[in-house]
Each structure stands twice: as C-alpha cells, then as structure tokens.
C-alpha cells in the first residue's frame, strides 16, 4: 500500500494470506478493527477475516452491501470474528469499503464472547 495512506477502523482491506505450506498466497478481504489512534501510532493493524463462504458458523456476522458505509460487496459475505490477525500496514493491497458502526459493535460483542468463554483450567 502506498505510504502516507491512513488506515481507519472499520475499513475493508485486501491482504495477501499465505497458504499453510507457504508455497503461495491468496488475496483475501479483512475488516480493520484496531482503533484509529492505534493505527496512527503503530506499524501494524488488527483485522478480522471476511469470507464469501456464506455458510453461517459460530462467531460469524453476515455482511451485505447494506451494511457498508462506503463501497459495495459483490456477494453476501461473512465476517469471521474467530479469525483475527495482526498485520504490518505495508502488506495492505488496497482499501475497498467501510462497514457501518453497528457492524463494528457486533464484532466487539463476538470478540468478547470468544475471550470470555469458560475453559477448563488444569
């Protein structure tokens, strides 16, 4: 991504994701969840994955173009709040949309549920 472009919370970005065997990579969309202040003061951003596989599963949020403040989705997609990544801003390929505030609130709710799940302690 060209330097000098400021990434904002709620933006939808395109990022390269490597295959698990690291032989290749594929471009995938993601939603920026780190705060604007964090994004301004750090080289990294925090994102959650976005997929066009519209099969509902735990910790997913359905996303349509109606849920966007900016941009358009070609197909109904799912936000995978269980797939979060910290990435260097330099690998961002492009910004192509921004989700509405209510979607960020849903993302936060799901992240809190993931963090607060009861686990067995050994």
Predicted regions and their residues:
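Helix-hairpin-helix/helix-loop-helix acidic hairpins
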Residues: 1-2
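C-terminal terminal-subdomain/extension
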Residues: 5, 69-122
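Short, charged beta-turn/beta-strand-edge "cap" motif at the junction between a beta-strand
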Residues: 18-22
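Compact nucleic-acid interaction/catalytic patches
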Residues: 23-26, 32-67
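A structural motif
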Residues: 30-31, 47, 81, 107
């Amino acid at each position: 991504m060209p330097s000098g472009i400021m990434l904002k919370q709620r933006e939808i970005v395109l990022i390269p994701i490597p295959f698990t065997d690291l032989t290749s990579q594929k471009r995938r969309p993601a939603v920026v969840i780190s705060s604007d202040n964090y994004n301004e003061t750090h080289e990294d951003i925090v994102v959650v994955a976005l997929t066009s596989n519209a099969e509902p599963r735990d910790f997913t949020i359905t996303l349509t173009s109606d849920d966007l403040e900016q941009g358009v989705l070609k197909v109904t997609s799912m936000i995978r709040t269980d797939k979060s990544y910290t990435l260097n801003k330099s690998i961002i390929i492009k910004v192509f949309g921004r989700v509405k505030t209510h979607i960020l609130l849903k993302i936060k709710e799901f992240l809190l549920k993931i963090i607060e799940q009861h686990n067995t302690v050994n």
